């Protein structure tokens, strides 16, 4: 899982779902219930559009974040970059859940595999530096 600036609460909720999925998988196994965690990438929906709109409402010239507003906008728009069509996502998800032994973890959609792989492979300091640069946090304010 890749944690990014300006999405702390969102990333925390994804981490919570990850932990809950792991616990439920173990707890429900004796009952024959299988738990599959889905980690979607960019999916064509109104989520990113709404996030961009909300971000604009919070960024004002009086905000301490004003100097790095473009980084905030970039994060809010991140899911708009080559999103997977929702019909393709739904088709692939349905196919996965219909397996006799569905995967424990399913990553679907643009960026769903590459971004977590980067987070896993890159040294933490290098990843932090890249994210700070990408979102305009590499200079003192």
Predicted feature residues:
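A hydrophobic C-terminal alpha-helical subdomain
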Residues: 67-84, 88, 130-141
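Proline-centered helix-kink/hinge sites
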Residues: 5, 40-41, 86, 123
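Functional cleft and adjacent loop/helix regions within the main domain
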Residues: 103, 108-109, 122-141
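Active-site loop immediately N-terminal to the catalytic Tyr-X3-Lys motif
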Residues: 2-9
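Active-site helix of classical SDR
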Residues: 13-16
């Amino acid at each position: 899982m890749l944690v990014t600036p300006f999405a702390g609460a969102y990333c925390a909720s994804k981490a919570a779902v990850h932990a809950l999925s792991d616990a439920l998988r173990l707890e429900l196994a004796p009952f024959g219930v299988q738990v599959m965690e889905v980690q979607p990438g960019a999916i064509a929906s109104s989520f990113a559009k709404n996030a961009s709109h909300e971000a604009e409402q919070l960024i004002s010239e009086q905000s301490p974040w004003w100097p790095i507003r473009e980084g905030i906008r970039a994060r809010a728009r991140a899911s708009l970059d080559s999103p997977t069509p929702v019909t393709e996502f739904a088709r692939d998800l349905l196919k996965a859940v219909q397996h006799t032994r569905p995967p424990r973890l399913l990553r679907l959609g643009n960026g769903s595999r590459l971004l977590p792989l980067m987070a896993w492979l890159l040294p933490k300091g290098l990843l932090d530096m890249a994210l700070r640069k990408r979102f305009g946090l590499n200079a003192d304010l």
